[in-house]
Amino acid sequence: MGSAYKMLKNDKRCVRKHSKTIFLELFSISSSSSTQDKILQEIENLNADPFVHGIIVQMPLDSHEGIEINSHLVTNRIDPDKDVDSLTTINQGKVATGVLNSFIPCTPAGCLDLIKQSGVKLEGANAVVIGRSKIVGTPVTQLLKWNDATVTTCHSKTQNLKGIVSQADILVVAIGQPQFIPGSWIKTGAVVIDAGINFIPDSYKKSGK
């Protein structure tokens, strides 16, 4: 059984997992050189293509000639039945209300799997999520909540962050800032996941980071 997924990149791949083969066709629609209308039209074409089963828009979207592209409008144009990243309002609403038998955002789902594999008991656990983006922070909070953890979401306006973090049985950091949480804040035995994308100095890499 095969499934086809399309992403806004330039590549073609075939991924085999268990007994299924997933064909990935990645192609480029550069948001820095394409208008918003062109991107929306391409998504409509993919929505109508019966051979495409999933669509992922690679974020963030760049501006075009100084005009910002509305990422919410773009992602919300995807057919919810093909929205494998769960970025449409409909699919986000399902996750928010505990309807988890549809698409779950990949990174939040991966965080939940890692937490379960750690052996920590989710029911009643004190979970702290730092970050509230719709891509990671918010859906992680919702998934933990629907798995019966007691969840606190922290952000840039949160007071007494150290005190909150120090009580966490589970800590998920979903912000783009490295070394934001000192190790001294984290209690012994806590499960910690850094889901942020951070660039830090690395002398072993050609790029230096």
Located regions from the model:
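Short, well-structured alpha-helical segments in soluble
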Residues: 38-50
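Short, high-confidence coil segments that cap the C-terminus of an alpha-helix
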Residues: 51-52, 168
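Short beta->alpha junction loops
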Residues: 24-37, 156-158
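Cationic, amphipathic, low-complexity alpha-helical segments enriched
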Residues: 7-8, 15, 21-22, 26-29, ...
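Anion-binding alpha/beta catalytic cores of soluble intermediary-metabolism enzymes, centered on
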Residues: 53-126
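Glycine-rich phosphate/diphosphate-binding loop of Rossmann-like nucleotide-binding domains
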Residues: 2-17, 93, 99-195, 200-209
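Short, small-residue-enriched loops and turns at beta-alpha junctions
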Residues: 3-6, 32-34, 62-65, 199
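Short glycine-centered, acidic/aromatic-flanked micro-motifs in structured strand/loop junctions
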Residues: 1, 29, 57-59
